[in-house]
Amino acid sequence: MLCNISQFLGMGDVLCLKQSPFSLMNISMSGQFTTHLMVSFFSGLIISSPYIFWELWRFISPAFYTSEAKLARGGVFFSSVLFLMGILFGYYVISPLSLNFLGSYQVSDLVSNQISLTSYISTLVTICFANGIVFELPVLVYFLTKMGLLTPHIMKVYRKHSIVCVLILSAIITPPDISSQILVSFPLIILYELSIKISARIIRRENKK
């Protein structure tokens, strides 16, 4: 489906990984076995992420007032949803873009890309988990605002700087294609705007008390 979307947007096959642009190889006796274990571990970590967030919430909840604790309890659900959305975004959008670009990039025709299995999986895991963490921005903003360390005014002042940083980052990790850059940067900008709304709502609620 993503391949069809990619072609519909005029991006070619940048979201497709039908045929790897490089050959994978194993250069260690136990490389495939340890890679299998690593994939199993991180898969388990992703699946159990709602429970991990719940345990984190149980650890920090005593620091909240009763009314605040009830209000923030839904944060466990939203943290889990945002994290899983980030993982999926990283796996289905960022990974194909990055792997296709990096796998076919050459400084010279004399150098061929033969990527080790461990390097490939490590890159994939890093991309997915990095996106999962980035998608936690609204939750982070919520807690920073509650602690008085962040205000919507500050976020609005640095909005342009943040958008520029997002565009630069998306240009680095994607091929030199404007459609790919928009596809990567748009969800991150939406997250930033959502975080501003969350921060403003918390400030209004605090002012009413």
Please state what every model-predicted region is:
Residues 1-209:
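Membrane topogenic/interface segments and analogous intrinsically disordered interaction regions
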